[in-house]
Swiss-Prot record:
NCBIfam families: EF-G (TIGR00484), PRK12740.1-3 (NF009379), PRK12740.1-5 (NF009381), PRK13351.1-1 (NF009891), small_GTP (TIGR00231)
Protein name per UniProt: Elongation factor G
Main location: cytoplasm
GO cellular component, one term: cytoplasm
Family under the similarity heading: Belongs to the TRAFAC class translation factor GTPase superfamily. Classic translation factor GTPase family. EF-G/EF-2 subfamily.
Annotated source species: Magnetococcus marinus (strain ATCC BAA-1437 / JCM 17883 / MC-1)
Entries under PROSITE patterns matching the protein: G_TR_1 (PS00301), G_TR_2 (PS51722)
Length: 692
């Protein structure tokens, strides 16, 4: 079967933005104008086509990046809708990995908002070419030039207008295309589907010419010959101008800025034209790099149907009708339904079931996908996010995505026995869909602990458990894994004797307990000389000591970093047994440890906060109130990086507090550093709470 659309007519794009910049509305309008959606869905009515999970429709925020295919001017555009909330940056990471270009949507009133900075940094990391769209130009206080300036100041982006707005706020009528100098005036009656193309209005001609010169000079940096032609006073044609613009966008030399109001249906068609004109097609990337699974040598695949098949799974979703959907981006070759491919990341074969093109939550079955396509596959059993599917005879592993470690954990308990069984299945499914969400069972408390990227993230997980899997669960407070240790050396004698007629019990040991190096754990040393305790009983002593340590002596938390030496003792020919020595060892540890000045230890986290200078004082003051110790500060771009060590117990609710403290502009990472002694007054409080 021949290719339906030439590879150079394919565009894989994402739409990224801050939470309220109007990203979903922009996507909706694109679907409307490209004929994919017959009725425009408004987000604030809870009806947008892309926001198709129930939680999204209620909250009016986009959580899951749905992939949609549409057509514009004989080009196929695959759109990945990305979430704009800090807790969902994992989704943004995933979608950026498989895009060839991204439209960054900004609010005409607020300009660059906090999450835009985070997403922009992620796009920089993956080297994604960008266009910017300043939306909401019809709103009170909208200012195109100010919005462009915030992109320069906050994102350090080389943002250059490619359009000039005609009118502002409620008088916004359209915009001038700086390349052609034509004015586009939109007709409100036809929902903006019809517009007039006129000459540039005279009252803004001077501003338009000045802006056009700036754009032209930046574009011509891509071509020395054309630059010379321009400097010699010759006219640059529109085709030459556009070709330089395209090269500039693909090489990320600068970011052209467009404007409009998606809600008022102005400017979206011109944005689509820009996507087609300036963004790269898959064939503009010379090749994609990967590794050979056996030798880890570098290997490449060119974006061509003739190359061996290679694709990356970038998202997994559970669909109520067809089961698991795996979204893949095909980089090379052809994949047909009904064939077998290799999951090179796991070295397992996978059978390809149905292949589908997705339109938000409507779908179309297809027989095959080719290089450059994005589609959903039904029925993959072993493939998770970030893994490579490829030709079994030509294996390759494409780059693996890095996912951040979760920063918050809570315990969940099913309300009934029936919920218990369903909860296991639900959590396993959700963890498979989302690599930034982890599930583990705490062996000490037997609780199921779920951890993720923030409180909203876990709220939505619990919400989905209820809606999709009908699991009712109680959600606990976040818990800290405390530990105990000793602070001085002690020698202690322990004797376990039971004589009650017949065979008795006899075990007698001398133990030396010493504090061990932090992090060294429990160490047992056999120091018996001359067989005073027979060899066969020594493992029993070790087990008894180990069990007592697991249960703790001071508050009841497991003990760590203790060195225990068995150095003396005695036995009875008849009455001694493994059980007697195990009990003697256990008693010896408990009694000895209480004399060795036991203390409580708590996990100390290494925390890094990246914050704009304005919030530095608040962040530092807040750190101190959490018993944090500032380790150092450094510059990070136009932000400041604060490094601190903070007890985990002080970090609960931090994501939410930091967000409100910095209006969402500060970000933080946190990972386990080491255990340290809890101050005595706090240890006593914990003891009182725990032992009741």
């Amino acid at each position: 079967m021949a290719r339906e659309i030439a590879l150079d007519h394919v565009r894989n794009i994402g739409i990224m933005a801050h939470i309220d910049a109007g990203k979903t509305t922009v996507t909706e309008r694109i679907l409307y104008y490209t004929g994919r959606s017959h009725k425009i869905g408004e987000v604030h009515e809870g009806a947008a086509t892309m926001d198709w999970m129930e939680q999204e429709q209620e909250r009016g925020i986009t959580i899951t990046s749905a992939a949609t295919t549409c057509f514009w001017k004989e080009h196929r555009i695959n759109i990945i809708d990305t979430p704009g909330h800090v807790d969902f940056t994992i989704e943004v990471e995933r979608s950026l990995r498989v895009l060839d270009g991204a439209v960054a949507v900004f609010c005409g009133v607020a300009g660059v908002q906090p999450q835009s900075e985070t997403v922009w940094r992620q796009a920089d990391r993956y080297g994604v070419p960008r266009l910017a769209f300043v939306n909401k130009m019809d709103r009170m206080g909208a200012d195109f030039n100010k919005a462009v300036q915030t992109m320069k100041d906050r994102l350090k982006a080389r943002a250059i207008p490619a359009q000039y707005p005609i009118g502002a706020e409620e008088d916004l009528r359209g915009m001038v295309d700086l390349i052609t100098r034509k004015a586009y005036i939109f007709n409100d009656e036809s929902l903006g589907a019809e517009f007039e193309v006129l000459d540039c209005p005279e009252d803004i001609e001077a501003e338009v010419e000045e802006a056009r010169e700036a754009l032209l000079e930046a574009a011509l940096e891509q071509d020395d010959t054309l630059m010379e032609k321009y400097l010699e006073g010759e006219e640059i044609t529109i085709a030459e101008f556009k070709s330089c613009m395209r090269r500039a966008v693909i090489s990320s030399a600068f970011v052209p800025v467009f404007c409009g109001s998606a809600f008022k249906n102005k400017g979206v068609q011109l944005l689509l034209d820009a996507v087609v004109d300036y963004f790269p097609s898959p064939s503009d990337t010379p090749y994609i790099e990967g590794l050979l699974p056996d030798s880890e040598e570098a290997a490449v695949r060119k974006p061509s149907d003739e190359e061996p098949f290679a694709a990356l799974a970038f998202k997994i979703m559970t669909d109520p009708f067809v089961g698991t959907l795996t979204f893949v981006r095909v980089y090379s070759g052809v994949m047909e339904s009904g064939t077998s491919v290799l999951n090179a990341s796991k070295d397992r074969k996978e059978r390809i079931g149905r292949l589908m093109l997705m339109h938000a939550n409507k779908r179309e079955d297809i027989k095959e996908v080719r290089a450059g396509d994005i589609c959903a596959v039904v029925g993959l059993k072993n493939t998770t996010t970030g893994e490579t599917l490829c030709d079994p005879n030509k294996p390759i592993i494409l780059e693996k995505m890095d996912f951040p470690a979760p920063v918050i954990a809570i315990a969940v308990e099913p309300k009934t026995k029936a919920d218990q069984e369903r909860m296991g299945v639900a959590l396993q499914r959700l963890a498979q869909e989302d690599p930034s969400f982890r599930v583990e069972v705490d062996h000490e408390t037997n609780q199921t602990i779920i951890s993720g990227m923030g409180e909203l993230h876990l709220e939505i997980i619990v919400d989905r458990m209820m809606r999709e899997f009908k699991v009712d669960a109680n959600v606990g407070q976040p818990q800290v894994a405390y530990r105990e240790t000793i602070t001085q050396m002690v020698e202690h004698e322990s004797k376990f004797v039971r004589q009650s007629g017949g065979r008795g019990q006899f075990g007698h040991v001398w133990l030396r307990l010493e504090p061990n190096e932090p992090g060294a754990g429990y160490e047992f040393v056999d120091g018996i000389k001359g067989g005073v305790v027979p060899k066969e009983y020594i493992p029993a002593v070790k087990n008894g000591v180990g069990e007592a340590m697991a249960n703790g002596v001071y508050v009841g938390f497991p003990m760590v970093d203790v060195k225990v030496t068995l150095f003396d003792g005695s036995y009875h020919e008849v009455d001694s047994s493994e059980m007697a020595f195990k009990i003697a060892g256990s008693m010896g540890l408990k009694e000895g440890a209480m004399k060795a000045k036991p203390v409580l230890l708590e996990p100390i986290m290494d925390v890094e906060v990246e914050t704009p200078e304005d919030y530095m004082g608040d962040v530092m003051g807040d750190m101190n109130s959490r018993r944090g110790q500032i380790q150092g500060m450094e510059d990070s771009g136009n932000n400041r990086l604060v490094k601190a060590q903070v007890p985990l117990s002080g970090m609960f609710g931090y994501a939410t507090d930091l967000r409100s403290m910095s209006q969402g502009r500060a970000t933080f990472t946190m990972q386990f550093g080491h255990y340290a002694q809890v101050p005595k007054s706090i240890a006593e409080e914990i003891k009182a709470k725990t032992t009741g």
